[in-house]
Structures are given as structure tokens and as C-alpha cells.
């Protein structure tokens, strides 16, 4: 995925998920995506290079970092629980969708049971 499409694609995929809120609590240079008031994705740039921060299971995080050169420990985040995704040939829309969905689900899993039922009906 190239530099221009990383943010656009990630934003579109995140906003397809139920009950997602887009806000800018850290200023206009950080798109912040929340579910139930908790952050699951941040989108910004570092020295002109776009990146996406996503919550990640620690084991999956390490595996993805070994497989995909464009996935690094989370920039300015807890490196055990967050990853940063940078532009790269190996970053496909399908991979990005899986990473975003995993992040959303990890955050929802941490919500109160009543909130989980509200955002994950059925």
C-alpha cells in the first residue's frame, strides 16, 4: 500500500465498523478512532511518512512484525500492545482490514459487558 492510500483506506475501513467515533483530542494532525470511548486506531504522519497505530495481541504483534517489514512496534504507544503500520508493498487492504478488525475487537473485549452487548448485538 502506498503513502497516499494508507490513511484513506484505514479511515474507510475503520468507519465501516459499528459505533466508531472519529475525533481529534490530540490536535488536527492525529485522527483518533474510538469505540466505547476507548482508542483502537490513530492515524498520523512521522517526518512526512503516514502511519497507523493499532492495538494488537502481543503474540500476533511479534509475528506480524517478523512477517511484514512495514509493521513496527507502536510509535509513542505501549510497544507490547500496539503496532504501527507504515506504507509498504506487503500491506494489502485485506491485511489492513484484519489488523483494524482485530484492534476494534480487542478494545470491545475490554469494555463492560453491557457495552459489549450494545456494540456486538447477537
From Swiss-Prot:
UniProt superkingdom: Bacteria
List each coiled-coil range.
none
Q: Which Gene3D superfamilies match?
A: 3.90.1150.30
* InterPro entries in alphabetical order: YjbR, YjbR-like_sf
Query: Can you say what this protein is called?
Result: Uncharacterized protein YbdF
- UniProt gene name: ybdF
Q: Name one Pfam family in it.
A: YjbR
Amino acid at each position: 500500500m502506498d503513502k497516499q492510500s494508507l490513511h484513506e483506506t484505514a479511515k474507510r475501513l475503520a468507519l465501516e465498523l459499528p459505533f466508531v467515533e472519529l475525533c481529534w483530542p490530540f490536535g488536527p494532525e492525529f485522527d483518533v478512532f474510538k469505540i466505547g470511548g476507548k482508542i483502537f486506531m490513530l492515524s498520523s504522519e512521522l517526518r512526512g511518512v503516514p502511519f497507523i497505530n493499532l492495538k494488537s495481541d502481543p503474540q500476533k504483534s511479534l509475528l506480524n512484525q517478523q512477517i511484514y517489514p512495514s509493521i513496527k512496534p507502536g510509535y509513542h504507544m505501549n510497544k507490547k500492545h500496539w503496532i504501527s503500520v507504515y506504507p509498504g508493498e506487503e500491506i494489502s487492504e485485506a491485511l489492513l482490514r484484519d489488523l483494524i478488525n482485530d484492534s476494534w475487537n480487542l478494545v470491545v473485549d475490554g469494555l463492560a459487558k453491557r457495552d459489549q452487548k450494545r456494540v456486538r448485538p447477537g
